[in-house]
Regions:
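Long, amphipathic alpha-helical coiled-coil segments characteristic
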Residues: 1-33, 37-40, 59, 63-86
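Non-catalytic connector elements of ABC transporters
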Residues: 40-41, 47
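Hydrophobic, amphipathic alpha-helical faces that serve as interaction scaffolds
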Residues: 49-58
Length: 86
């Protein structure tokens, strides 16, 4: 789980940077990376959210991105709190 924490924070920052740059394809690519690692540690809610970002990013669906993105950091935060408590 320790190998998940820092990379996940970095990928979330990539997604935020891509959002600021209005680069939907980069959001999709970063969402794909975090989706896979989230699923591998059992963080299914985060993985599902990242799957949405991957799909909407690849489709350049800004409405979908705008709906999903605000949930990213709070969801990751809950997972990181849980991991730190182990």
């Amino acid at each position: 789980l320790g190998d998940f924490v820092e990379p996940s924070k970095e990928i979330v920052q990539e997604i935020k940077d891509a959002y600021e740059a209005r680069d939907a394809k980069a959001i999709g690519a970063a969402g794909h990376k975090l989706k896979s690692s989230s699923r591998s540690v059992g963080a299914n809610a985060l993985s599902d959210l990242c799957a949405t970002l991957e799909k909407t990013g690849k489709a350049e669906d800004w409405d979908g991105i705008d709906d999903a993105l605000p949930h990213l950091e709070p969801t990751l935060g809950l997972i990181l709190e849980y991991i730190e408590g182990l």
